[in-house]
A protein has these predicted regions:
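Membrane-interface helix-boundary motifs at transmembrane edges
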Residues: 59-68, 112-122, 167-180
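Hydrophobic transmembrane alpha-helices of multi-pass small-molecule transport proteins
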Residues: 52, 122-140
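Hydrophobic core positions of alpha-helical segments in small-molecule transporters
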Residues: 11, 15, 42-43, 72, ...
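Hydrophobic/small/kink-forming positions within alpha-helical transmembrane segments
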Residues: 21, 25, 53, 74, ...
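Structural motif at transmembrane-helix junctions in multi-pass transporters
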Residues: 32-39, 83-99, 175-178
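Glycine-/small-residue-enriched transmembrane alpha-helix faces in small-molecule transporters
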Residues: 1-39, 128, 132-135, 144-171, ...
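Loop-to-transmembrane-helix transition segments
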Residues: 8-16, 60-83, 149-158
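C-terminal transmembrane-helix exit sites in multi-pass transporters
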Residues: 56-59, 86, 103-128
Length: 186
């Protein structure tokens, strides 16, 4: 791999990590502006949806060719993102993020079940630590460790849904990235 490509890849990862880490700030700003509940998520995703309408029209032929598989994958990934965004509104940001980031646990299990991937001892240890972390968030030792509010449930569901969407993306690698991204919104 050449250095220029590696540097661009590193910058892309840095940028994506920064955007993902700051994702919650506009959601909370909308909430502080007086927009409540699901309306926060609706308004948050309305702007990119409006900007993507011309791209969706331009790619309509390819979206139709992708058929139900592409549409289902798009609905799952878009639904996961919507659940995640809404979970931030209904629970603490840290709880929402940590519960969403159980995605590797669900992804490992799905990879084993549907792709026959091996689960290494290191992966098992990391999954156990992640589950212990989740149980701690839910109050292990203080009360029965279950999600405490609708935002917690949405955080867990968003991570699970994202893992299913990621599995579908791996199974349908012939779809273009732009069509997959459009599936988030349409």
């Amino acid at each position: 791999m050449n250095t220029s490509f590696e540097n661009r890849a590193k910058l892309a990862c840095l940028y994506a990590g920064g955007v993902w880490g700051l994702f919650w700030i506009p959601l909370r700003a909308l909430e502080e502006a007086g927009i409540n509940g699901l309306w926060v998520t609706f308004v948050y995703f309305l702007v990119p949806t409006i900007f993507l309408i011309p791209v969706g029209i331009w790619r309509l032929k390819y979206l139709k060719l992708g058929g139900f598989n592409l549409q289902l994958t798009g609905m799952l990934s878009g639904g996961a993102l919507m659940l995640y965004a809404t979970s931030i509104v209904y629970t603490d940001v840290v709880r929402a993020m940590l519960l969403f980031y159980l995605t590797p646990v669900w992804g490992t299990i799905l990879g084993r079940l549907f792709l026959n991937e091996n689960i290494t001892p290191l992966r098992i240890i990391s999954m156990i630590i992640a589950i212990i972390g989740m149980l701690t968030i839910f109050g292990l030792g203080v009360k029965f460790p279950i999600p405490q509010n609708v935002g917690d449930w949405m955080g867990v569901a968003s991570g699970l849904m994202w893992a299913v969407a990621s599995l579908r993306i791996r199974l349908n690698q012939n779809a273009s990235a732009i069509d997959m991204a459009l599936g988030f919104f349409f």
